[in-house]
């Protein structure tokens, strides 16, 4: 994190939250400054140590460090969540399509979709059964995310119990609900000369054969399909790289979480993802820069039950998924964005 970004966060927190302002106690002794409190929270997140890490460095008690971390994460979400965890607009999708078509050869690709488990050491005993899965070493909570080629996280959904698989998480995620409710932004494109009304996500083999999902061939029968399988698996690693960078930047996510509630875990996870996107923007790696907070986006009307049923039917229409996969697997993967 750059010094400029750190000072920006400190100034915004001091301006909007009384907790981060320096105040005197009953004896007139001044307490910690906003810079000290933000440094405390960032040290815990970056190094992944326990909350007594600042005993000697900042002369800050363990409870103060823990409270500061909670206020810091909540402040980051409230101040920056609307910008750095926003849903892409139509204009954003045009830029995303262009970048992914140039970098990966996939026109219409919105991003890569996958899940990550975070160990929960202090999971209540009564909940351990539903948070434990055989391939994990203990209770976990699942994060589902969508990442771009530059590792920007467009969508994050955290809080599903660890016993679920990727299909269960996907089926209950707001990402799928937005498509069914017709709230998801859509931009059409062409694949192999065929018109496609909306984009898609690259996923691994466990995900269902939905129209917004592109998987690879399990057993390619010719060189073109084998090449497609290689490129698809390589491009899908964007989300794996993103998870690796998140854990490397914020070691707190690599270690088992010691929070007592999932809400505190959720605040930490979303705060780390938001700061991850802020760092990418500060380094000039962001694809979309057209966020205008003054413009109030028009609320989407509620879809009727009939519309929801039709959208769900179109979403689960396997022939569309198969046709799109064949288009990519039988020709050179070059397409153009269709401005509709």
PLM region spans:
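Short, polybasic Lys/Arg-rich linear motifs in disordered N-terminal/cytosolic regions
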Residues: 1-340
